[in-house]
Amino acid sequence: MPEFVALSPNVEVIGQTVLAVVDGMGAFRNLALEILKRHGVDNPNPEGWYRQQLWLDSFKEIYERVGKSTLNLIGRKIPENAKFPPEIDSIDKALASINVAYHINHRGGEIGRYDFTKLGPNRARLVCANPYPCEFDLGLIQSMARRFQPVGRTPSVTHDETQPCRRKGGASCTYLVSW
């Protein structure tokens, strides 16, 4: 599944998630709004719905103009802007909830998924089969892990290079989380 290409032309993403692009670009907020506008997302409303492909086109331009580290920052902002189930109180529940939140914040067709697997008491795996870029998903997972990290533990998130990668034409990317 290629990066930056929606799985269905009818998929939409909620505006509060789109606004993560603006928040993730920090001092370059105006550039983010300009890029979004150029791709058909003018003055996004947190409660509005926008075609996912327009948002992905904006991501691609940000990647090409500003760099992949900005996509990571945008991913890190998602937990601050997206709707998540209220009962999350541990790193395991937080990581497992990414798929639920992903489906709450998208509608209109096939969107892909985030598959969570607990590998041990302090380890987990997430397989991300969606059209978002690797760096974005890495930032999203890092943010969720840090937000719900156990006291005295520092989470680590790595892209599993032994597994397929969307950037290299794979259908998914795999991330390993330890804490």
What do these predicted regions represent?
Residues 21-22, 75, 95-98, 157-158, ...:
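Generic hydrophobic, helix-prone segments enriched in Leu/Val/Ile
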Residues 107-130, 134, 150-179:
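Short terminal or interdomain "cap/linker" segment that borders an active site or interface and mediates
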